[in-house]
């Protein structure tokens, strides 16, 4: 962390003495720069290209040194578009890595990868900045305490609970609800836990980033009147950005989160949407840097790049960073190297299922594929563990019977299996839940369900006490009392129709 005595631009540190070079080659977002002998910049140093294009427009491009090539040349990746750059342009070595503003000044604001505000709300206090490249906390600084992080979402809290200070992956293909689930988590956590969040939009749709910002202002997560009371800082490097920006924007967001953890000693939530785009950006740059591609065309440094980001996301004795990462799964293939590498770092996985989304069950979290290292009786308690296991067994049995039902029909099943199917269908529907952030689509008010209420509801379904209720009564409700009330309403409606 650096305390800057004077307020300078947020992207890089003050230039003490200018070490100048010249562009000798441009290949898309990758630049080769020649420096004087003995004046070579270090790896990860920020370089600034300043000049004018052919129509007299001012150019200001920041790059990051990736390789030292020999012959006094370095290869750097641009953090913004390289349009208008020409060979021979002057390049200045800043002598330090990219540094971004950190602390309370970042709350309620939107930044780009360089830490520059992009929300037209004026400049940000840049007296306290921090470099985006730093090592992970030492082993002795880590905190190993195990505790559950309640989200208020039934299917998550019961079957794949999140660890406070852990890493959670949201897996799913395109259009199954990852971003909506992330927005709901930000909303619930800000309201129920009062925690500070940092949101890193890595290579996703600009429209979604804008929607999220407006949604946060409406829900009070961002306080427009007093930004210091906001609960989130936003860092965006969206789909339209060059790969250099998408590759580094995750580190910018993480740097801001680390300050809240290490200096302010807070529990922080770091959302990354989408970690796959981080890998994809690295893959785009990798070939231009002259590396041979690895499996399925990914960069050979995939594991190293992922590890350097993920190992910094951890709990220390000062505070914690709980990270929730959306993971796009290419062609719904979980064995693809990008999602497979991400799996190794996670404490819990929330897998979204296209089949459930097609049935209209939202959140479309697959109760059998989603896992958590926290679902152990010594951590969550016997009652929670036993209820979760029985729910999974019932749903697994229903899955096994589906082929028989499709061929022969329900009537060919034994009495016991018919009862299992009926309860499984109720459980499946009760795992759905109306979201606060989806009120505009569904027209139903959102529900936050505490863990004790969630366990009580599923125990009642498993016990058979609610066997007489219609299964549609369990669809898109909060706790079990709402389901029984809905059943009574349905009963009255059917009587009126008769």
From Swiss-Prot:
EC number annotated for this UniProt entry: 7.1.2.2
UniProt KW keywords: ATP synthesis, ATP-binding, CF(1), Chloroplast, Hydrogen ion transport, Ion transport, Membrane, Nucleotide-binding, Plastid, Thylakoid, Translocase, Transport
Single GO molecular function: ATP binding
GO cellular component, one term: proton-transporting ATP synthase complex
PROSITE patterns reported in the protein's UniProt record: ATPASE_ALPHA_BETA
Coiled-coil regions, chain positions: none
Top-level EC class as recorded in UniProt: translocase
Localization terms from the record: Plastid, Chloroplast thylakoid membrane
List of residues binding ATP: 172-179
Catalyses which reaction(s): ATP + H2O + 4 H(+)(in) = ADP + phosphate + 5 H(+)(out)
GO biological process, one term: proton motive force-driven mitochondrial ATP synthesis
Location (main, coarse): plastid
Membrane topology recorded in Swiss-Prot or TrEMBL: Peripheral membrane protein
Function according to Swiss-Prot or TrEMBL: Produces ATP from ADP in the presence of a proton gradient across the membrane. The catalytic sites are hosted primarily by the beta subunits.
Family: Belongs to the ATPase alpha/beta chains family.
HAMAP family, A to Z: ATP_synth_beta_bact
Subunit (UniProt): F-type ATPases have 2 components, CF(1) - the catalytic core - and CF(0) - the membrane proton channel. CF(1) has five subunits: alpha(3), beta(3), gamma(1), delta(1), epsilon(1). CF(0) has four main subunits: a(1), b(1), b'(1) and c(9-12).
Protein's name in the database: ATP synthase subunit beta, chloroplastic
Name of the coding gene: atpB
């Amino acid at each position: 962390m650096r305390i800057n005595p004077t307020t300078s631009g947020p992207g890089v540190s003050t230039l003490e003495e200018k070490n100048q070079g010249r562009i000798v080659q441009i290949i898309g977002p990758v630049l080769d720069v020649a420096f004087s002998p003995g004046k070579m910049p270090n790896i990860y140093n920020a370089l600034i290209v300043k000049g004018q294009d052919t129509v007299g427009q001012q150019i200001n491009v920041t790059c990051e040194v990736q390789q030292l090539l020999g012959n006094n040349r370095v290869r750097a990746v641009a953090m913004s578009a390289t349009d208008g750059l020409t060979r021979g342009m002057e390049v200045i070595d800043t002598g330090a890595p990219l540094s971004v503003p950190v602390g309370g000044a970042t709350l309620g604001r939107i930044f780009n990868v360089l830490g520059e505000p992009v929300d037209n709300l004026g400049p940000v206090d840049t007296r306290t900045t921090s470099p985006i490249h730093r090592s992970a906390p030492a082993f002795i600084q880590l905190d190993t305490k195990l505790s559950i992080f309640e989200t208020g979402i039934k299917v998550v809290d019961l079957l794949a609970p999140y660890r406070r200070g852990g890493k959670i992956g949201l897996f799913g293909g395109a259009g199954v609800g990852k971003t909506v689930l992330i927005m709901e988590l930000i909303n619930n956590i800000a309201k129920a836990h009062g925690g500070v969040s940092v949101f890193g939009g890595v290579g996703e749709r600009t429209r979604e980033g804008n929607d999220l910002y407006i949604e946060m202002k409406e829900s009070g997560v961002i306080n427009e009147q007093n930004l210091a009371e906001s609960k989130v800082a936003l860092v965006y490097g969206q789909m339209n950005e060059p790969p250099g920006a998408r590759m580094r924007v995750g580190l910018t967001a993480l740097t801001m989160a680390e300050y809240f953890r290490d200096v302010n000693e807070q529990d922080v939530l770091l959302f990354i949407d989408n970690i796959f785009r981080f890998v994809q950006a690295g893959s785009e740059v990798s070939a231009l840097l002259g590396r041979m591609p690895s499996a399925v065309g990914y960069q050979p440094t995939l594991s190293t790049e992922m590890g350097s980001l993920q190992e910094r996301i951890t709990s220390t004795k000062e505070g914690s960073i709980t990270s929730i990462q959306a993971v796009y799964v290419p062609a719904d293939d979980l064995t693809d190297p990008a999602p497979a590498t991400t799996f190794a770092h996670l404490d819990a996985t929330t897998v979204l299922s296209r089949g459930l989304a097609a049935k209209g069950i939202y959140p479309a979290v697959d109760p059998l594929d989603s896992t958590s290292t926290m679902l152990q009786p010594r951590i969550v308690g016997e009652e929670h563990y036993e209820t979760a296991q029985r729910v999974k067994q019932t749903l697994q049995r229903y899955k096994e019977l589906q082929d028989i039902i499709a061929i022969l029909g329900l009537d060919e099943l034994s009495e016991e299996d018919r009862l299992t199917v009926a309860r499984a269908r109720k459980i499946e529907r009760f795992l759905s839940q109306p979201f606060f952030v989806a009120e505009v689509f569904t027209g139903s008010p959102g529900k936050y369900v505490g863990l004790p209420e969630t366990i009580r509801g599923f125990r009642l379904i498993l016990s058979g006490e609610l066997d007489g209720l219609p299964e549609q009564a369990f669809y898109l409700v909060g706790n079990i009392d709402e389901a029984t009330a809905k059943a009574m309403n349905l009963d009255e409606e059917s009587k009126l129709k008769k």
